[in-house]
């Protein structure tokens, strides 16, 4: 992720502190350690700190501009926004908002899911992410190929820009054409966007 991170230097009394690495990933995590974690919300529940996205800080920016404006400013676009959509579902299935949002975005674009080369589907919780993946029929090989929010974190204020950036960099890395970025939003909403590599 180094190419996606702009290092921030903070001057302290002890000297410079450089923020240039995502601190959320835990490379030493094991299945055994995850299996021992206690449920977070209900005594007999299945959601634990190991299968839920982390609560962490983050910042991201994502510039959307008309191609001619970008060219005049001397910038080369990474991609073109093909379509986007928002949708809502009943509160009791609030994590499934990406399902209708994705279907609407695909329909607006005149594209199908199998045309997507990269899919970033934000993971609030494993159960939520699995439900979205199952209902939409997401290809596991194309979905969150470099880790999702459970592994990398879910800095709420920047998650949309964060996962869109990840998708575009991966699209360029593999030489793909289209990517889908989708996430649930509190209260039953979902959002999805489709980009085409420039």
Residue ranges and their predicted role:
Residues 1-72, 135, 140-142:
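N-terminal extracellular/periplasmic Venus flytrap/periplasmic-binding protein-like
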Residues 12, 38-41, 85, 106-109, ...:
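Structural signal for hydrophobic packing residues in well-ordered secondary-structure cores
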Residues 25, 44-60, 82-108, 121, ...:
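Active-site pocket-shaping loop/turn-to-helix segments
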Residues 33-36, 101-104, 108, 131, ...:
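Alpha-helical scaffold segments in soluble metabolic enzymes
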Residues 48-65, 160-198:
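Conserved beta-strand-centric core segments of catalytic alpha/beta enzyme folds
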Residues 70-77, 103-117, 136-137:
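Phosphate/pyrophosphate-binding loops at sites that engage ATP/ADP/AMP, CoA/4′-phosphopantetheine
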């Amino acid at each position: 992720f180094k190419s996606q991170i702009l290092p921030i230097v903070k001057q302290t009394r002890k000297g410079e502190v450089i923020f240039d690495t995502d601190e959320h990933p835990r490379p030493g995590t094991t299945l055994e350690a995850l299996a021992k974690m206690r449920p977070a919300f209900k005594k007999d529940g299945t959601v634990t700190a190991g299968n839920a996205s982390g609560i962490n800080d983050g910042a991201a920016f994502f510039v959307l501009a008309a191609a001619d404006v970008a060219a005049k400013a001397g910038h080369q676009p990474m991609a073109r926004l093909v379509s986007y959509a928002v949708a809502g579902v009943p509160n009791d299935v609030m994590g499934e908002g990406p399902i209708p949002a994705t279907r609407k975005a695909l329909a607006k674009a005149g594209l199908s899911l199998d045309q997507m080369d990269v899919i970033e589907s934000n993971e609030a919780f494993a159960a939520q992410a699995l439900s979205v993946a199952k209902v939409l029929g997401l290809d596991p090989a194309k979905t969150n190929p470099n880790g999702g929010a459970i592994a990398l974190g879910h800095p709420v204020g920047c998650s949309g820009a964060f996962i869109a950036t990840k998708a575009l960099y991966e699209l360029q890395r593999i030489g793909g054409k289209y990517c889908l970025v989708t996430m649930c939003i509190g209260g039953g909403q979902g959002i999805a966007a489709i980009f085409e590599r420039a």
